[in-house]
Each structure stands twice: as C-alpha cells, then as structure tokens.
Amino acid sequence: MSARTPLPTVNERDTENHTSVDGYTETHIPPTKSSSRQNIPRCRNSITSATDEQPHIGNYRLQKTIGKGNFAKVKLARHVLTGREVAVKIIDKTQLNPTSLQKLFREVRIMKILNHPNIVKLFEVIETEKTLYLVMEYASGGEVFDYLVAHGRMKEKEARAKFRQIVSAVQYCHQKCIVHRDLKAENLLLDADMNIKIADFGFSNEFTVGNKLDTFCGSPPYAAPELFQGKKYDGPEVDVWSLGVILYTLVSGSLPFDGQNLKELRERVLRGKYRVPFYMSTDCENLLKKLLVLNPIKRGSLEQIMKDRWMNVGHEEEELKPYSEPELDLNDAKRIDIMVTMGFARDEINDALVSQKYDEVMATYILLGRKPPEFEGGESLSSGNLCQRSRPSSDLNNSTLQSPAHLKVQRSISANQKQRRFSDHAGPSIPPAVSYTKRPQANSVESEQKEEWDKDTARRLGSTTVGSKSEVTASPLVGPDRKKSSAGPSNNVYSGGSMTRRNTYVCERSTDRYAALQNGRDSSLTEMSASSMSSTGSTVASAGPSARPRHQKSMSTSGHPIKVTLPTIKDGSEAYRPGTAQRVPAASPSAHSISASTPDRTRFPRGSSSRSTFHGEQLRERRSAAYSGPPASPSHDTAALAHARRGTSTGIISKITSKFVRRDPSEGEASGRTDTARGSSGEPKDKEEGKEAKPRSLRFTWSMKTTSSMDPNDMVREIRKVLDANTCDYEQRERFLLFCVHGDARQDSLVQWEMEVCKLPRLSLNGVRFKRISGTSIAFKNIASKIANELKL
C-alpha cells in the first residue's frame, strides 16, 4: 500500500475552491438596481433625505460591517421603506470560479424554497454583473456555540426546547428532499426571543431516494461514521448523526467524539463510544442511542425521533410532529395598501408574490409582516416613522398552524418567561394609519462603502474567505462568564471560553477523502498553527450589544500556541455510564490550562488546518503548493505562513497600529500626557462638550463582564488606565466605546475587541461590555479576563 499523503497546512484565508493568499481583491461595486422597477420615480421624505449620505444597496441603507471574508462581506442594513433590520451579504462574483458560482446559486435556490420559522429567511436577491447581494434575516441572539461558551451546558428543559426546534427544521428540510450536511453548534443561531434559526446552507444539496451522494461535508466532530469510511450515503442519515452530536453538546457542553488529530477522532467516531455524564437523564441517554448509531440503516429517522419520550417531556399534549407549511398569504390587504402608498402598483405586487421573484416588491411585502425592530434604551423612536410597533404577524403565512416545536420556548435570559415570536402569530397586523417611508431612488453603493472595505483590509489578518460558503455570522461574546454579571443562567459547570469552533471539510473524491480523513498519523492538531476557512453560518448576526464578526479570526499563536478546547468530563467523583458500549478512554488534558478552575480538556484547536474546507482538486493543489515533506512543526507552519504573507503583513500592521496610541504603562493617567486626538480629560475632543451623554442600555446583559455603580466617565478612564498598563493599543471611537488591539500580527497573536460602558436595564448600575472583533477565542479570553480582573470598579 502506498503511503498516504499528509494533510496540508492551509492558510485561514484560503477559500474552499480557489485561494487568494493576499486576501480580498477589491473591486468597484457598480450601481445596483432593483430587479423589478428600474425607472419608476420615487420620492423621499425628510427622514430618508437626512440619511442620504449613507451608502445604499437597492432599498437598504447600509450600516456597519458585521462579517467579511476574502470574496464577500456582510453588512447590517436597514430597509428604508419599513425600517426593518436585515443582513446584506455582498459577494464579489469576479473572484469565484465556475464551480464556486454554481454552488453559490444552488445555495440561493435552496434557500428560496425553505419557509420555516426556525430557518434563516432569504428576502431579496440583487444581482449585478460583478456582484451578488443576498438580503437575509438578521438574528440578534448570536450562535448557540457562543451561548454555550458563555454559559456552559444547558439544563435539559432548555436543551429540549431548542432541540425540538432544530429537529422540526431539519425534518422540514428532509421533507423538501434537502440535506443540510453541515449541522453544528456554530450554524445554529438565536433570534431576539432566543429561538433557533438554522443557517448556512452552503453545503446543502437536494437528494433523491435511491441516488447516493458521495461528497464528504461537515465538521469532523459532527460527521457521521460512513463519511469517514468514504461510503456513499442517501442524505438524511448524516444529518441525524449530526443532531445526535448537537444534542450531546447542548446537554453536556462538550463533544461526544474528539481527538488530538483526525486519525484519533476518526477512530473514536468509528467505535461509536462516548461517555455519558452522571447528570444526563436516562431518557436523554436513550435518545442519543437512537441518533448516534454506527449503522446508518439502523439510525432513527427524524419522524421516529419526534415521537421519542425525551423530546415530548412537558409537551405530552402537543407531541412534536412534522411541520405543516401554511399556505402563503399573498393577499394581505393592509400590507398591500401600505405598499401602494409607497409607490408600488397592485399588479406589480401581485406578480412579484405569485412568481416568488425575491425582488424588492416581495421583500417589502415580507418585511412588512415581520416583527418591527426594538429600540434600545437611549435611541429615540423619532428616528423613524421608518418602523412601527405592532402585534407581530407571520410573514407570508396566513394560518394559525404552527409546529409544536415553536411553543413554550423559554428565554435563556429569563427561564420562566414564555416567549412568542412573530412567526407564531397569524393574520395581518399593520395598522393602516401608520406612516411608512416612500420608496427612494435606487442609489449606487457610494464611495463610503468602498472606503470602508479598504479600511477593513487591515483586519483581514484573521478573516476567512468566502466562496459558496460565504455567509458570515456575528455572535455574542466568547469569554469567561463573570460571576458579577447581574443576569445569566445558574447552570454553568465550567468557565466560559472552553468550546472550540469547528471548521468544515468538503472532499468530493475518494482519493481526497481518504487522504484528508484517514491520514493523521503525524498531523497532530497541536502542531498545526495555521488557521483555515470556517464553515460559516448565515448572514444573520448578533445585535449591537452582543455582536461579534464570526469570520474575523487571527491565526493561532505560533511556537507554543494556547488552544481553546472543549472540556472533558472529570473522572473521579463524577460517575459515568457507558454510551453504547465501552467508555472511550479520556484524551490527555491540554498542556495549556486556561485557568486553575477550568476542567481538563481535550485539544481540538480553533482554525487548525485539519478543520479546513477542502474541495476535490483544490486539495491536491494545496498539497503541492502549500505542503511538502513531513508534517511541519508549529514554527515551520508559521514560517511558511509568514513567508506567504510577508508582502502584505507589514503594511497592514502599520495601518492598524498607526490608528492607536500606545502609552508607557509607567506613565498611566498620572502623567497628564495627552495626544492631539484627545482633550485633557482623555475624552475625544468632539465628544467633550456632550457631558450629558449617557451610556446606551443593553437588552442582553449576558455580554456584561463587570458591573459597577461608578460614574460611566470614571469607568472609561479606569478602562483606559488598565489598557495602558497592559500595553494595549486602543482608539476611543465614541464617548463610552473603545476599540482595542493587543498582540503581534506577525506572530499570529493579534486580538481586536471592543470595550463599551453600558447601562443595565432597570438597574442603577453600569457594566463593561466586551465584544471580540478578531483573534482566537483563547487569546481573547486571556487578555479580556486579565483586563476585567484588573479593573477597579
């Protein structure tokens, strides 16, 4: 037998299909036009004209960038006609090869036919010669992955509520003959009411009974054993296995199968053995035995899983059943009347809805039926009759039908408070007297956007690329869950920051699959410090107080990298029951403990090359281009990466550091030194006059790390003092908001984050919000914890 080719180390910025080492090649974005009305004159009222200086795409006013990759970026936007917030994914088609484009349009086609309350909704598709814009649902709760990092495992009642929604949505996809193939905690998002939204259909495909699929898709810890064996599969059964891993992760806060390299992980998956923690109920254990079955033929179907006892505890009168999609409500008179006042013709509205065009007309109709945005404290409602407060309605659906999975969902913030979402309600909900903005002229993407893209280039050190997997998710803070926080669940069993983000494999040919998955003898993941493209979520993102661009990750630390790891369950006092048979021996704990109180963990680092996204020929190309000889040591990997990036890294670093002021820690605040950008008080000069300014109030308080009754201005000064003491660069962008940088990009240890002083709702307390912008979670956790602990508030 010939020797297997070692797994190559792949740059984090490599896309799944073709690679640009230098990152995103910027192209000018031409003026966009609505796909349905190009020359209709539209008028603006005073509100839209006041914001004309902001860039627009179609009817969407672009706001901040919430994620980016080499060939795409995602921006938070507001629909100027309705005031609803959306996420706009902007994809540079000129950077994609034909295969990538084909998969991108397959993803769009699949999303158009999905209409489930627990699946991210596509609103509008705008296409120009060089650019594709996907307007999608914006979720404000972030990823389930980051929720678990911040809070630890869920109680089974909470996990059940989430898992019922997940199963309902996945079974709905299977009804439509669609298999997701990349189900994992990173691709499960939370909306404003903490309900599940399944994202990232970049690896999904349509399946036909009797026709086998053969592409390896998914993150290895979530991948079914038949994928590791290179066998062909029908489709749904690989999703069922992934759901078993997800359920285990929700309930235990760790992965059932993990390893220090792919070979070890593969062996554990093929054994099918996992440890059952003592706190897991027998019913939950029995459900896992139906999901995590090695033989795909004997693996339970989702229809059977829906009837499982654990799934329906507390829901005995409303057993989970397959989702019955209501008929589309295409004749909501109130919404149509409002659209007519905006300048749409009734025939145009009817044609767009009947034909399902996903143009500006259909998007406006859908958005009018969605839940209006909720304003945070301090933001004036007078910033628009762009939106209204009304009883939620159900998008296009005019039916009281709903899946039982959507009922009795407990808010994670308040475990006893029952929440309903807009999609659970039916019927029109828009008061006819409400004033909406008329349609503005279709504006081009203004120069501000281009400038921002150029400015954001400085952060591409940690960004990942986007091909057909171009959707980016922003999420809540990943970091330690401080006990001082005034809100948060009480079921934490380990400190935050212990979970590891999983990237995604794709191998389309058996030779690639075996080379990538069966090899692993020497490719210990602890030896690979180069990061790769993440299998990303949807373009939905977290709301302001808890948002973090998911794609913006730095390379892992070279030399002696400290890895973020999942916790192993302690032996000793904790009793375990075997999973399906014998226990899997516990993996050796990481040599780098996160803290003294952190449990032992198995190492499976974020962004290692063995978590890369591979596609057929590109795997072989990368072997020859990025790898030669035996597996490299950390220093070898880093040297290769540094050589590949040397042409751009220096300029990028200088751009980053030139924006910040680094002070000698010995000088501190007592030196009285000020720079040209700041007044004597240390506040930005243009902010000094607004002494009456107050911190904004947060809705989600679980991103708070420290609370205090101190004056917010004094808190900002204390934060700056601690940042100076830790040699952190920072820029005070707003009165209570600091953009911070720490580490050396040339050593792949650069971390960027925001610190903001915010007010806690209904309490006379202020808190410090940490939001990671880029860098590995362990590097961020280390510096954020150090700063939080040194703050004297």
Swiss-Prot record:
GO biological process terms, alphabetically, are: cytoskeleton organization; establishment of mitochondrion localization; intracellular signal transduction; microtubule cytoskeleton organization; negative regulation of epithelial to mesenchymal transition; negative regulation of gene expression; neuron migration; positive regulation of gene expression
Give the activity regulation note: Activated by phosphorylation on Thr-215. Inhibited by phosphorylation at Ser-219.
Q: How is it modified after translation?
A: Phosphorylation at Thr-613 by PRKCZ/aPKC in polarized epithelial cells inhibits the kinase activity. Phosphorylated at Thr-215 by STK11/LKB1 in complex with STE20-related adapter-alpha (STRADA) pseudo kinase and CAB39. Phosphorylation at Thr-215 by TAOK1 activates the kinase activity, leading to phosphorylation and detachment of MAPT/TAU from microtubules. Phosphorylation at Ser-219 by GSK3-beta (GSK3B) inhibits the kinase activity.
Checking InterPro entries in the record gives: KA1/Ssp2_C (IPR028375), KA1_dom (IPR001772), Kinase-like_dom_sf (IPR011009), MARK1-4_cat (IPR049508), Prot_kinase_dom (IPR000719), Protein_kinase_ATP_BS (IPR017441), Ser/Thr_kinase_AS (IPR008271), UBA (IPR015940)
Disulphide bond pairs: none
Q: Which residues form the active site?
A: D182 (proton acceptor)
Q: Can you state which reaction this protein catalyses?
A: L-seryl-[protein] + ATP = O-phospho-L-seryl-[protein] + ADP + H(+); L-threonyl-[protein] + ATP = O-phospho-L-threonyl-[protein] + ADP + H(+); L-seryl-[tau protein] + ATP = O-phospho-L-seryl-[tau protein] + ADP + H(+); L-threonyl-[tau protein] + ATP = O-phospho-L-threonyl-[tau protein] + ADP + H(+)
Biased-composition ranges, Basic and acidic residues, are 447-459, 661-676, 683-695
User: Which terms in the Gene Ontology molecular function aspect does this entry carry?
Assistant: ATP binding; magnesium ion binding; phosphatidic acid binding; phosphatidylinositol-4,5-bisphosphate binding; phosphatidylserine binding; protein kinase activity; protein serine kinase activity; protein serine/threonine kinase activity
| Compositional bias per record (Polar residues), positions renumbered to this chain | 380-403, 462-473, 487-499, 647-657
Outcome (variant: S219 to A/E): Loss of activity
Q: Spell out the residue ranges making up region: Disordered.
A: 1-40, 377-499, 517-697
Instruction: Provide the UBA domain boundaries.
Output: 329-370
Q: What cofactor does this protein call for?
A: Mg(2+)
Question: Which enzyme type, at the first EC level?
Answer: transferase
PTM Phosphoserine: list the residues.
S219, S382, S390, S393, S403, S423, S444, S475, S588, S666
Residues of the Protein kinase domain: 60-311
Q: Where Phosphothreonine occurs, residue numbers?
A: T5, T208, T215, T613
State the family named in the UniProt similarity comment for this chain. Answer: Belongs to the protein kinase superfamily. CAMK Ser/Thr protein kinase family. SNF1 subfamily.
The UniProt comment on domains reads: The UBA domain does not seem to bind ubiquitin and ubiquitin-like and might play a role in regulating the enzyme conformation and localization. Activation of the kinase activity following phosphorylation at Thr-208 is accompanied by a conformational change that alters the orientation of the UBA domain with respect to the catalytic domain. The KA1 domain mediates binding to phospholipids and targeting to membranes. Binds phosphatidic acid (PA), phosphatidylserine (PtdSer) and phosphatidylinositol 4,5-bisphosphate (PtdIns(4,5)P2).
How does this polypeptide assemble, per the annotation?
Interacts with MAPT/TAU.
Q: What is its biological role?
A: Serine/threonine-protein kinase. Involved in cell polarity and microtubule dynamics regulation. Phosphorylates DCX, MAP2 and MAP4. Phosphorylates the microtubule-associated protein MAPT/TAU. Involved in cell polarity by phosphorylating the microtubule-associated proteins MAP2, MAP4 and MAPT/TAU at KXGS motifs, causing detachment from microtubules, and their disassembly. Involved in the regulation of neuronal migration through its dual activities in regulating cellular polarity and microtubule dynamics, possibly by phosphorylating and regulating DCX.
Listed name of the protein: Serine/threonine-protein kinase MARK1
| Originating species | Rattus norvegicus (Rat)
